[in-house]
Structures are given as C-alpha cells and as structure tokens.
Swiss-Prot record:
CDD domains: PFL2_DhaB_BssA (cd01677). This is Isethionate sulfite-lyase. It comes from Desulfovibrio desulfuricans (strain ATCC 27774 / DSM 6949 / MB). The gene is islA. Its EC number is 4.4.1.38. It catalyses: 2-hydroxyethane-1-sulfonate = acetaldehyde + sulfite + H(+). The modification Glycine radical is found at residue 806. Requires the activating protein IslB to generate the key active site glycyl radical on Gly-806 that is involved in catalysis. 2-hydroxyethane-1-sulfonate binds at residues 189, 193, 468-470, 679. Homodimer. InterPro entries: Form_AcTrfase_GR_CS, Gly_radical, GRE, PFL_dom.
Length: 831
C-alpha cells in the first residue's frame, strides 16, 4: 500500500505527505527560527572535525610521565584555548564541539589504531558515512595517528584477551573485526551512558567547584603518600578543567560581542549581546534565568562531549525538573513566553542534531546504524517524596516533540502508578505522532530494584534515563565500563554443530557437547544448550575482568568527576578505581531472546515430545537453509512462540533468564566487584549478530536478523500487543536482583490509535505496561506501505523518522538489512 492510498496516516506521515505535495509545514509560522536552522544542514552528510583529536594529541605528547587525570585536564585546557569557536546565524545558544553543519569528532586515545582505516573508509562506507577534507585526512594520518600507535585502549585490550576469549570476540589477530559471538563494547566508547548533575552546575557554577577543589587541596596531609600521589593530581585536574570550560565559554562571549558590533539588524544585535552576556556569566557562575540555565547546561553538555566519548552518550537528565525553577520564575515575572522558552529548547535540539556520534571502527559502526544518538531528555517521574513530578515544562517539552520536525533529542517519559491522566494523555498523543517518541520507562520496576541494589528511595526516585534504556542515578552511579553483547542464538547453533558454527567452518568455538542426533531426551539437548550458554557468560565476564583492570591506565574524566559528589568527596576520578559509597551498575546483553526461546520450544515440542520431526531431518533442513524443506520450516513456525502469552514458550524464556541472572548473582560481586546485570538491549546489533548465525530451529533463515531486545521474533507475536507485554513479564525472574533493562519494540498502525478512542486505548495500554512492572517499551506508529515506499524512493521520504533501538533515526539512513528488519516487525492493527 503506497502512502498516498493509506486510509489513515500518523501526523508524521501526513506532514511528510504535505511536503511531498509541496504544501508548507503548518508549524513553520510558529517556529521560523528553528526551521531556518534546520534547513541549513538538512540531508547533509556529517563532516569529521579533527580539532579535538589534534589538540588532545598535541597536549598528551607534552605531558607524558604525569598522572593521567592531570594530563587529561591539561589536554582539555589546550583544546579550550585553541579550538575554533562559532556563533551560528539564528542560534540563541553558544557552544559546539566542531565545525558548522552536521559534524563528528575523533577520540584517538580510544581507537586511534583505526584512524588510517577510518579516514579512508568513512566517506564511502554503507552505514553512517561521513566526509573529511583531504587536508584533514592528511593531518590525521601524519600528525595524529602515529602518536597513538601502540598506545590505544583497543590495542591494549586486544593484546590482553586470552586465546580462548579472543576467538569468541574477534575474527582477526588485530581485533579489527568482530566475530559477533561474545562482543566487547568498551573499545569503541570510553564509557557507558552517563548522566551529569546539571542542577549542581546551574545552582553553583564551575567556579564554586574549583573553590571546593582548592580548599580540599589545601587540606591534604603533606605527609601522606596517597594524598600526594592520588588526591593532589585529581584536585589539580579539577581546578584546571573548571578553568578550561569557563575560558571556552568566555571565548564565545568575545566572538559574540565582535559580531554584535558588525550586526545591522537591531533584533539580532540585541540577541548577540545577550548571548555574550550569558557566556560571560555561565557556566562559571550560577544561572540567573531560563536563558542562562539553557546556556549553562549546553556548555556543560558540549564540553563533556569534547572530554571523551562518554560525552556522545551524555544524557540530558531530568530537564523538566532542573529547568523548571528558572522557567517558573521567568514566566511569573513576565520575562519569557511559552513560545520563547520553546524556541530556546529547540535551539538546543538543533545543536544536538548537528553533533553526530561517529563510530569509526567497523564493529562500532555496525552496532550503531543511522547515526545513533542517546542524549535522552527525561520527563515525568516522581519527586523525592514520591509525588508526581510532571509540571508545565514537562508538557512544553512533549509539545515540542510533536511540533519539532527532527529526531533530536531522544525523549524518555517516566511512568508510575499515580501518573495523572493529563500526563499519560499527552504522552500517548506524542507517541501517536509517529516518530518514536517518547520511549517509556517504568518507575514501578526501576525504583524498588535500585533500592535492592543499595540506593535510598530518594536516590532511586531521582533516576534519569540514559542511552537506549538505562537508568542512572546522578552522584550514586560510579561504574563506567561498557559490557559484553552475547549472541545466544550462536549457542543454539553450537549445540546443533557440536561447538562449531557454519560461518566459521570447522574451528571449535564452543563446548563439544556431542552430536545432537544422539540425544534421546529434551534434558540432554537443554543441558547442552546450558553448557554453551555458561561458556559464553564466562567469556563475557573474563572480558569484563580484564576491561576493569585496563581502563584506569587509559582513561580519565576530570570534568565528569568534578560534577560527581562521591568523586569529589573521595578525590577519585570516575575511571580510576571503585569509588567508596558508589553503586556499580554494569551489564551484559542477551542477544536474540525470541529467536532462542522459539528455537528451543520448537525442538522440545516437535522433536522430543510430539516426535513429529527427527533431529537428523531438522539439521538437514537447517543445513539447506530450508530450501527443499519448506514443510519442515512451516512445522517449526507452528510451534509455541514467545510473545503470545504462551506458558510453554515463556517457561523456557524464564529458565534462560534465570540461568543468566543466577550466574550474575554468583560471580558479579566476587569476580568483578559490580552488579553485572543481564539486559536485553541490542541497539542495532541484532542485525550483524544475525548475519553470523545460520538457520535456526524456529524457521529463521541463515543470516536473518535475530529478534531484537525482549521483543518477539519477526511475525511470531500473533495474539496482540497485550500478549507481548504478558510474555515479557512472565519470562522475567522478579525475585532475582541482578537484572536490568529489557528493550521492547511494538509497532502499531495509525488506524489502531486513531482519534480520541485510540488515545484512550493507548493510555490503557501504558497503564497495563506500568502495572506489569516492565522496564521499557517504545513504539512505531507507521503504515508498512510508507516504509516500503521510502525504500523505493528514499529522496522523497528523506525526512521519515522511525524508532530503531533506544533512539529514532531517518529511515533512509539505515542499511537495507535494518530497513527490512523494521518492515518485518509485526504490525498490530488492534489493541
């Protein structure tokens, strides 16, 4: 069905259709500034800006032998002094990490051994390409890359992995290509997703933090070796980085004043002078009004992205909470209108859209298609005393997401049992718009779980969403290492192939559990799967053990640490060691839950219980990728499936979850010193993970994507969306602590949620999600015909936004494989 013949369209589809037909966007008149800003980079391929990498490298060359945290701070000061600053036409906020338009920056300390490959391949690679000028490419190869050869974190990790771990991790000796079996993720980002305490900066400013560091420095014990060798460098680094961000801001103020002197338009002249005044005051000092609060937060966010690759996944935190006092004050004083406040927020949204989180390694690129971004803004939730926290700014941000024609920022709405009807209605109306916002995160699951891990109720109630589905507690979270992604569908294949995989030939990768044709009982098959499963978990935990040992030698985060209460209290950088009083929330990802559950259910039911299929014939059909075995495939696809509230399948899923969580309970704290929780959050990696797995016993064909997150297999959820929620609930072991996020994707047709009745149904569905204590759910509201049409004519559908993993992206920026994956997801037309 083509878009032009759809009986019912989402508002996004209608907006897109209006543009195709040449009609003006109805929001252009109310958002003229933002539309002008957007049109300057619409459809633009990102450009790599090398200044951050160049100045960081220059400084690190000069400071060898000094404590790493001090070197990092000095590098940030060198960047702050020398990096080009910009004042964009029409913008009301100052601060960029790179050039005009869409841009990305490089972090050579992380994966600089990929730089030669990156500058060669980035412009032409199929997923998330970027441009780089010939001169910048030359400087990368000649001035930046040589220094980092042999010094990068990725090289150190690759060398440290034992052979039995390496063979399940990488497909080459240098560790450039992943095997997509047990995949480490720490080498293409400096840290997992993070949330800063922005409220602290708005209320205190960096000059106050510098003063605190100076006082702590003066109070150190002059006879203590630890104070001298560890605390002193940390505090000196904090003082330097506080000066660096203030200097960087003031350089923007100078440029804004220079531009104001030349500006002939009196309105723009006044804006530039006010922007200069803002940058002279914040983020060094406390914000005095809403505009300064936005500017202070934006400087902080952008300098965090300059600091390290954590910054590319820096969450915006609970923006409706920490901005609300400034918004309320200015509204009551008549200093700002709702439209002016929205314009400031949307200037920030534009800045987020221009910064592209570039993954230069082949594996990182495969994991994060469509220029993945996780700068989540969290709205709603609860106050420290447990009351509903929604306010005027909550509704303004939701309204902006319905009117702002871009997939930035990512938006997360916290849901709890006492959420007011007005809030849920606005959330539902925003979901119905069709661009995938907001994703929903459930207080009823997260708050008690975090209390069980050691948080106070007040701390747990103040969590903010970060990354795809993560929940972070500012000033209590202290763990930064990325976790492993584990392809458990490969474990099923290894049972069928005696520890081997078709993709990798005769190499023994897993446990030799025997020829499955010799198995006479389901228990034998199940136990063989458990052996492979446990090997994968041990491999992941071994990776994490080594990662934890290496990170302190390669990373420091003086600015992020300066904003963290516990880091300042104990004078410890976030990357250096376990921080006293912190809660270390790590994770490993279960890839392919639906694929594995359905495969095991089919084997149990059809081979061992009903004996409708022999193991020999099953393996022959899988080896043939079901060609000539269409009857076998049809039989397999008729077996019980996860996502249908079918206890037969769901019980297997619950057992799988229990094995993973119990392993974590046993070894996380003893071996790693962290809560290494099981999660089901694939980003876009279920596509490349599926490419290495041959056909599976659920009827999935060779190379087809695995099921994503905690969602059902493609087309397997035939009993409606509520059954999907119920399966998600019943496969979770509620009584076990070391568990975390479950990403759940659901696709509705616009007709399903049409009108007020559709909104009422969606609100009811959200309340069911909340009552079942599920972690996360997100929606696509789009017609399949629109997606198919966009594949055929990508230029015409350039602005079509879809929900992918924990973020939204332009559909046409996705690979054909990921586009097809989205199209193949079950489309629910009733609720």
């Amino acid at each position: 069905m083509s878009m032009t013949t759809c009986e019912c369209r989402s508002p996004q589809e209608q907006r897109l259709y209006d543009k195709i037909e040449g009609r003006e966007d109805r929001f252009r008149k109310t958002h003229p500034r933002v539309f002008r800003l957007l049109e300057r980079f619409e459809g633009q391929k990102p450009r790599i800006d090398i200044e951050r990498a160049l100045y960081f490298t220059q400084s690190m060359q000069e400071t060898e032998g000094q404590p790493l945290v001090l070197r990092w701070a000095k590098a940030l000061m060198h960047i702050a002094r020398n990096m080009t600053v910009y004042v964009q036409e029409d913008q009301l906020l100052l601060g960029r990490a790179g050039c005009d338009g869409r841009y990305g920056i490089l972090y050579p300390e992380l994966d600089g051994d990929f730089l030669d490959i990156a500058v060669r391949d980035l412009p032409t690679r199929k997923t998330s390409p970027a441009t780089i000028t010939p001169e910048d490419a030359r400087r990368v190869v000649e001035e930046i890359a040589p220094y980092w050869k042999g010094k990068t974190y990725h090289e150190a990790l690759n060398a440290a992995l034992p052979a039995e771990v390496h063979k399940l991790t990488y497909d080459d000796p240098e560790g450039l290509i992943s095997r997509f079996i047990v995949n480490e993720t720490s080498s293409f980002r400096s840290s997992i997703q993070w949330v800063h305490d922005y409220e602290k900066i708005l209320k205190r400013g960096f000059n106050s933090i510098k003063k605190e560091a100076r006082e702590k420095l003066a109070a150190l014990d002059p006879l203590s070796a630890k104070d001298d060798r560890e605390k002193r460098p940390f505090l000196e680094a904090v003082m330097i980085v506080c000066d660096a961000i203030v200097l960087w801001a003031k350089r923007h103020a100078v440029l804004a004043r220079e531009m104001a002197e030349k500006e002939s338009d009196p309105v723009r002249k006044a804006e530039l002078l006010r922007m200069a005044e803002n940058a002279e005051h914040v983020p060094g000092e406390p914000a005095r009004d809403f505009w300064e609060a936005c500017q202070s937060q934006w400087f902080t966010q952008m300098f965090s992205r300059i600091e390290q690759k954590t910054g590319t996944t820096i969450s915006n935190g609970r923006m409706d909470q920490y901005f609300q006092p400034y918004y309320k004050q200015d509204r009551e004083a008549g200093k700002i209108t709702e439209a002016q406040a929205m314009e400031l927020l949307e200037c920030m949204w534009v800045g987020m859209a221009e910064f592209i989180d570039m993954y230069i390694s082949p594996t990182g690129g495969a994991f994060n298609e469509g220029y993945a971004h996780w700068e989540a803004v969290t709205v709603g939730g609860q106050t420290p005393d447990g009351r509903d926290a929604s306010n005027d700014l909550t509704y303004l941000i939701l309204k902006s997401k319905r009117e702002f024609p871009l997939h930035y920022p990512d938006l997360a709405a916290r849901i709890h049992s006492r959420a007011p009807e007005r809030y849920l209605w606005d959330v539902a109306e925003t979901i119905k718009y069709g661009s995938g916002f907001p994703k929903l995160i459930n207080d009823e699951e997260i708050v008690p779980l975090y209390v069980s891990k050691g948080a106070t109720f007040e701390e747990a109630l103040d969590y903010a969403v970060s990354g795809c589905t993560e929940a972070r507690m500012p000033n209590r979270d202290t763990y930064t290492s990325g976790g492993a992604y584990i392809n458990f569908a490969a474990a099923v294949e290894m049972v069928l192939r005696n520890g081997r995989m078709k993709k990798y030939g005769d190499q023994k990768l897993g446990v030799e559990t025997g020829d499955p044709r010799s198995f006479t009982t389901w228990d034998q098959f199940w136990n063989a799967y458990v052996e492979q499963h446990l090997l994968f978990l041990k491999t992941a935990f071994t990776q994490q053990y080594i990662i934890n040992k290496l990170r302190a030698e390669h990373f420091a985060q003086p600015m992020g640490s300066a904003m963290h209460d516990l880091c300042m209290k104990h004078c410890i950088d976030l990357h250096q060691e376990q921080i006293p009083e912190g809660i270390n929330l790590g994770y490993f990802e279960y890839m392919g839950l639906g694929t594995v559950v359905d495969s095991l259910a089919a084997v149990k039911k059809l081979v061992f219980e009903e004996k409708k299929l022999s193991m020999d014939k099953l393996i022959a059909a899988i080896d043939a990728d079901f060609e000539g075995y269409e009857d076998v495939r049809a039989l397999l696809r008729s077996a019980p499936c996860y996502g249908n509230n079918d206890e037969y399948a769901d019980a297997i899923g619950r057992d799988i979850d229990r094995i993973s969580v119990e392993y974590g309970n046993k070894y996380s704290m003893s071996d790693l010193g962290i809560h290494n929780d099981v999660r089901y959050v694939p980003f876009t990696s279920h596509v490349p993970f599926g490419k290495v797995v041959s056909a599976t016993p659920n009827g999935r064909t060779d190379g087809f994507p695995l099921s994503d997150g905690s969602s059902a297999s493609h087309g397997a959820d035939v009993n409606g969306p509520t059954a999907v929620l119920l399966s998600n609930c019943t496969t979770k072991n509620m009584g076990l602590r070391d568990r975390a996020a479950r990403m759940l994707n659901i696709k509705f047709t616009p007709k399903c949620v049409e009108g007020e009745q559709g909104t009422e149904k969606l609100v009811s569905f959200i309340r069911t999600f909340c009552d079942l204590k599920l972690w996360h759910v997100q929606f696509n509201v789009v017609n399949k015909g629109t997606l198919v049409a966009a594949q055929k004519d990508p230029q015409k559908y350039r602005n079509l936004i879809v929900r992918i993993a924990g973020y939204s992206a332009y559909f046409v920026d996705l690979s054909p494989d990921l586009q097809n994956d989205l199209i193949a997801r079950t489309e629910h037309d009733v609720m």
